[in-house]
Amino acid sequence: MSSGRVGRAVRESVSGLPREFWWLWTSTLVNRLGAFVATFMALYLTLDRGYSASYAGLVASLHGLGGVVSSLGGGVMADRLGRRPTLLIAQTATAVSVALLGFMTHPVAIAGVAFLVGMASNASRPAVQAMMADIVRPEDRVRAFSLNYWAINLGFAVSSMAAGFIAEFSYLAGFLIEAGMTLACAVVVFAKVPESRPAPSARQEEAAVGLGTVLRDGRYMAVVGLSFLVALVFQQGSVGLPVAMGRAGFSPADYGLAIAVNGVLIVALQIPVTRFIEHRDPRTLLVVSSLLAGYGFGLTAFAGSVGVFMLTVCVWTLAEIVNAPTQTGLVVRLSPVHGRGRYQGVYTLSWSVAALVAPLMAGAVIDRLGAGWLWGLCAVVGTGAGLGYGVLMRRLPPERAVGTAAPATAGTEAAAGAGADVPAA
């Protein structure tokens, strides 16, 4: 492909999105560039502090539990207080708690602050997703969510590489750098990102949306359930795969080489793949991506070399690239405008719970039945999710066309009655 065609493709991928989106995107990228603690936390606790692997696992679980709690709380805050205040509170709290964690020495204090870090860091996710849905036109949302997902993975890839060098110098420096970068995100949001929550008066006849409304929305909760199944499969890349490779005699470096394929492919392919899938049938994309995820991990049962492990990672990474923006777009499509925060919070909860369940599932299956059964189970779960999406999406009403080409600011979309959004059941 010529440089001219490449440049044109890049321009088409990033054009047409509002300025507010790009400031929010920048905040996300900066946040992930500074995400050092998640990478070296286990090493910090076991090597630097001398705690056991069991204690490190407990701290990781408490961090995840904090995320589960704040998934719902962050969604409620995004609807009640607004997207911008929620982001500012969450990012400031994350910066303070991460810095504090670096100075903790007592095991109870470390565990408690890790829980707070999990709560604070996860509270911003529903607000970010709701804000993107507010400020981006419906026809551009899949592309916007893809670009945001790309920024997350690009930042994490860079921070993961930098974390090793920083840890050799000082673990405390890693905590403080992450705190500083997170605080910088809050500054960007404060200075450049306006509030996007639709004014209540714009839709006076709309019924109040509470958590009960979300939980009674059968169609939406079916999507959340399917999202949980897919997340359960994807989580095995970080919990089941390293254990299985270790038991098969492969070194940590071998696992690092295999899993690095995931980040490299996402950074390289997310934008071009998005151009291919942007206007395609989401039902087909979700069914195919679920099957690819399940069978990609299922193929791991036949891996006997690092090269084959890398090949299986390629398969399920392609599924991840397709599934992530399409799934998020479906969630927004089913969310009423004034309840987006709560709806996004419940959706985020599915991934948070999967992050807690996946390690338990992987450990139990590998210990009792063997790794082959885990990969077979992934194939079954992926197939079930694919069938579920096929049935669910067949019953969805078509998404209505957008009546204006102007950027869908909160006021514009609310005034138009959110015509491009399918009302929640």
Name these PLM-found stretches.
Residues 148-190:
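Helix-loop-helix hairpin linking two adjacent transmembrane segments in secondary transporters
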Residues 113-152:
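Cytoplasmic helix-loop-helix junction between adjacent transmembrane helices
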Residues 70-82, 269-282, 366:
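Helix-to-loop junctions at the C-terminal end of transmembrane segments
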Residues 180-199, 388-393:
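C-terminal membrane-cytosol helix-exit motif in multi-pass small-molecule transporters
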Residues 17-64, 220-258:
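Helix-loop boundary and gating motifs at the non-cytosolic
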Residues 85-99, 284-299:
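Structural signature of the two symmetry-related core transmembrane helices
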Residues 2-18, 194-225, 421:
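Juxtamembrane intracellular "pre-TM" segments in multi-pass secondary transporters
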Residues 68-105:
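Conserved MFS/SLC helix-loop-helix module at the cytosolic interface between two early adjacent transmembrane helices
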